[in-house]
Amino acid sequence: MSKSNGVSLAFPAEAATKEYAASLDSSDRLAAFREKFIVPSKANIASKKLAKPGLSPESCIYFCGNSLGIQPKATAKYLEAQLDTWSSIGVGGHFTDLEGSPLKQWQLLSEQAADSMSKIVGAKPEEVAAMGTLTTNLHLLLASFYKPTQTKHKILMDWKAFPSDHYAIESHIAWHDLDPKESMVLIGPDEGEYEISTQKIFSYIDKHADEAAMILLPGIQYYTGQLFDIQKITKYAHSRNMVVGWDLAHAFANVELKLHDWNVDFAAWCTYKYGNAGPGAMGGLFVHEQHGEVDYSAGEDAPKFRHRLTGWYGGDRSVRFKMDNKFKPIPGAGGFQISNPSAIDLACLCAALSVFDETSMADLRRKSLKLTAYLEFLLLRDYEEESRPFSIITPKDPEARGAQLSLLLKPGLLQNVAQKLQEAGIVCDKREPGVVRVAPVPLYNSFSEVWTFVKIFKDALQQ
């Protein structure tokens, strides 16, 4: 494909030169965003002692944003503001907006984060909540949306789901005294393939339509990097009377999303990958507005709302401190909150999101498409397909993938290649038995880094 999303993805012969990569960087309108991050140095990633960043002037090549994003420079500033608030006014931080702080008072802080995240996932602010972590949020959403009956009890899911998703779904099926072997349906690719076609998913939906209560898929498959057609799959599953949920761990802050317009029922994501909010950072969830309504037609003391597991922080602020044990949920996703969220975690999240507030997912996606296409172009050069010591198991179609390319090495190569990359100061992710996952991130990676990575990677393969 020579063009995608209005971006030219065709490269001339001279594109294989270091000078061409540098020319792409010089014309990159997003290049300045790299200065908003602390890129680990080669000396730091090799060191076994705790040290301040910048042990050496030469930065590593960090292509591991699909596992953990690097630290925004704003994080320290936001954390310091939060610690100063706590130390200077104590409990007053819950209700006081301090002049000069980038953060709202604590009781409004989750809304600050949700507002920024809503732009990233294509939702209304009230459809998003900043809370919990990914699997915890999936459990809460499954508790509300998975309502099995004697006839409709199956959940359709990815054949190679991230283990935590698998455990969560399996446990909810068992919680309802059902047999996961009967109620879990795994959708996999054709024999010898890695990509699951949309038509294959449709065929599973049709086959199990009378028995399936839900389909829950990853927006992007973590192992292969495949981006599923969320809009088409959601619409098709709805036509077969299924609830549709999405795990957006690898899609959040990576690709453009329009969860509201696509009529997705629910979704959850982590924020520490492409979102750069820090290890184990607070997650997010989406509940479509149709499921977040609160109906007071029967009276102020008799609200009707979607059944869910409840906690005091999901209660409307107007009644939150009345302590009368009459739960009145916040309309929207906020009503799914359980406990008072960590203001420290929210500071890290808001710091990371402040970077996204300065750009758009459309602009980031345009650069990402070209960055990953350039990576693919350089990787495939100089090899005949039958002699290439690796294959790319990520879809060739740029619209069917995010930033990541998954490189499946021939048997016996992984350990040596991984060691050579590490010695060269390259950080990327390996998955047994033979996959290297490479994810150039548009916020802080460059075309020159892609060029250097490919050269070192190919040298490692030859050794």
Curated annotation (Swiss-Prot):
Its cofactor is pyridoxal 5'-phosphate. The modification N6-(pyridoxal phosphate)lysine is found at residue 273. It is an enzyme of class 3 (hydrolase). The keyword Zinc does not apply. It is found in: Cytoplasm. Pyridoxal 5'-phosphate binds at residues 134-135, 162-165, 247, 250, 272, 312, 340. It catalyses: L-kynurenine + H2O = anthranilate + L-alanine + H(+); 3-hydroxy-L-kynurenine + H2O = 3-hydroxyanthranilate + L-alanine + H(+). One of its GO terms (molecular function) is pyridoxal phosphate binding. It comes from the Eukaryota. GO terms for cellular component: cytoplasm. Transmembrane segments: none annotated. GO terms for biological process: 'de novo' NAD biosynthetic process from L-tryptophan; anthranilate metabolic process; L-kynurenine catabolic process; L-tryptophan catabolic process to kynurenine; quinolinate biosynthetic process. Its EC number is 3.7.1.3. Belongs to the kynureninase family. Catalyzes the cleavage of L-kynurenine (L-Kyn) and L-3-hydroxykynurenine (L-3OHKyn) into anthranilic acid (AA) and 3-hydroxyanthranilic acid (3-OHAA), respectively. Homodimer. NCBIfam families: kynureninase. This is Kynureninase 2. It comes from Aspergillus niger (strain ATCC MYA-4892 / CBS 513.88 / FGSC A1513).
